[in-house]
């Protein structure tokens, strides 16, 4: 299933408040979801045929849910499909401005951070992460810097976060 679980997180705990499901059957391989709150969109980062894509949708509101707390998106609900470069495993991506920051790779393969302009659909940067011996898991930004988390084997409490200053972070 192509599912995004929406949780309400507070200091007291968390609870599932919505499940977003993509009902299209053209997607093969792994997928991930990326939220762009400023543009009120959600992107499905997926593979269609042999092409990695970002499929844009309006970000569902909580009251868009059915009686089961679900929102079902269909192919015809897509606002745009943005072709991406060859990226092995979609995960933990970030949209900021009109850029998608896409970590990629495993210790047994190449590890990179791809930056794609989602307006022009062009790759604008490709950062080599092979000097870091861990698997990139997620990316966030704050104060003009990117924070990239890496999975370390055997102990999730030992995960590493690296800080980068790269353009075009704004």
Model-derived features with residue positions:
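Recurrent small/Gly-Pro-centered beta-turn motifs in extracellular repeat architectures
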Residues: 1, 44-48, 97, 103-105, ...
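Hydrophobic alpha-helical segments and helix pairs
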Residues: 1-34
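Structural motif
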Residues: 2-8, 50-60, 108-115, 155-168
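A short beta-strand motif characteristic of beta-propeller blades
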Residues: 15-24, 69-85, 122-128
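Repeated scaffold domains used in trafficking and secretory/extracellular systems
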Residues: 25-37, 83-93, 132-142
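Short coil/turn segments that connect the beta-strands within blades of beta-propeller domains
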Residues: 38-40, 97-98, 143-144
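Loop/turn-rich, solvent-exposed surfaces of beta-rich toroidal or solenoidal domains
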Residues: 80-118
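Blade-level signature of beta-propeller repeat domains, shared across WD40, Kelch, NHL, RCC1
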Residues: 137-170
